Every structure is written in C-alpha cells, then in structure tokens.
Design a protein with these regions (language model features):
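Interfacial aromatic-anchored transmembrane helix boundaries in multi-pass membrane proteins
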Residues: 56-65, 90-121
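C-terminal transmembrane helix-loop-helix hairpin of multi-pass membrane proteins
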Residues: 136-147, 165-207
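Hydrophobic transmembrane alpha-helices
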Residues: 2-74
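Hydrophobic alpha-helical transmembrane segments
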Residues: 17, 41-46, 85-89, 112, ...
C-alpha cells in the first residue's frame, strides 16, 4: 500500500504531510503525559522494529498476488490508536529513507492512510464490538480498519489523478479485502497467545 514518489502532486503531498504532522504532534503530546510512558517507549521501539521488518516482506499467494500485511491493527490492540499512529510514522520514515519502501514526498499521505486513519478506525470499531466478543472485535476491527485505509488511499490517488476511480476500486479493494481477512484471523491468534503468555503487555491505557 506504500505510495511511491511521483504519484501525488507536490502541493497535495505537502498538505498531507502538514495534516499528518499536526495530528501526530497532538497524539504525541497526549500520550507523553501518561504515567506508563517508559513502558510505552519501550514497546513503541520494539513494535516499530517489528513493523519495519514485517511490512517490508511480501508473501506469495496461490492467486499470484504478493500478500503484504499491515501489522498496525495489532499495534492498536497493544498500545492504542495514538501510539500506533506514531509507530506507523516511524516505520514508514525508516522504510522510505533506508529501504526505498514508499516515497519520501508521499510520507504524509502514507502516514495518513496506513497510520492515522487505520489506527483510529481499528480502535473505534474494536470498542464498538468488544462488549459482544473480544475475538469478533479483533477480527472485525482489523478488517474495517484496513478497508478504511484502502478507501483513503483510493481517495488520495483519485484526486491526484494517478488513475481513475473505477480502476482504483477494482484493483485495490478486492486485494486488500483478502489481506484484511487474513490479518484479522492472524491477529486473533496473536492476541490470544499474548493474553495467555503475558497479559500485562496489554495493560497499557489505550487512550
């Protein structure tokens, strides 16, 4: 889902960067006042490294499409949406500067859809369904978050005239729906494992 350099006009890319940095600054200010800041910093560093590595690889599928996971929904379940957005920013920055994944000028757009929008939607949907069943909440929120990020990217690319809306919907939506379903199932397994091995990791206040 990384948007490369050259697809978005500079003015639009700059606008996305400014919006993303303003939102991230608010998130950082809010989370920096939490009493468990030291634990948050450690987990933020560890999870950022995991996201950088995990999202840099693709997995071949029988459909002939390379599967690329997001990991950020899992970070939301552990750290909450604000810290997850910051993790996304750090991971995308490292990938853009050091690994050539995603464009430097498109950093703001990538953070906006794969970090901020994804994290907030995952958390909101999780809270909505968590009273019904935790596993259902994990699955549905992962799927809805990734689909929301996909629609955000389609919107960004459409107004940049990178391609037509019809082509973007037809090419991106089915693929990321498949990824979302797979990642939702995987997140259930991982969260169940964490809960049984060391539930204290999940004790961090999410917002």
């Amino acid at each position: 889902m990384h948007i490369p350099d050259g697809l978005i006009p500079f003015e639009q890319a700059l606008a996305y960067l400014i919006v993303s940095l303003v939102i991230l600054s608010i998130f950082f200010y809010y989370t920096s006042r939490k009493v468990d800041m030291e634990k948050r910093l450690v987990l933020t560093g560890v999870l950022t490294a995991i996201v950088v590595v995990a999202t840099s690889f693709t997995i071949p599928s029988p459909m002939g499409v390379q599967i690329h996971f997001f990991i950020i929904p899992l970070v939301v379940f552990i750290l909450g949406p604000f810290n997850a957005s910051l993790v996304s920013f750090l991971a995308l920055l490292v990938q853009a500067l050091a690994l050539g994944e995603g464009g430097v000028t498109a950093l703001g757009a990538n953070v906006l859809d794969m970090g901020i929008v994804l994290s907030l939607v995952v958390y909101a949907v999780y809270k909505l369904f968590s009273s019904i069943d935790r596993r259902i909440a994990i699955f549905v929120s992962t799927v809805m978050g990734i689909i929301a990020a996909t629609f955000m990217q389609i919107f960004i690319l459409a107004i940049a005239n990178a391609s037509s809306l019809e082509v973007l919907l037809a090419s991106l939506l089915p693929y990321y729906l498949m990824v979302a379903i797979m990642e939702g199932i995987i997140n259930i397994v991982i969260m169940e494992f964490i809960s049984r091995m060391d539930a204290s990791i999940l004790d961090i206040e999410k917002v």
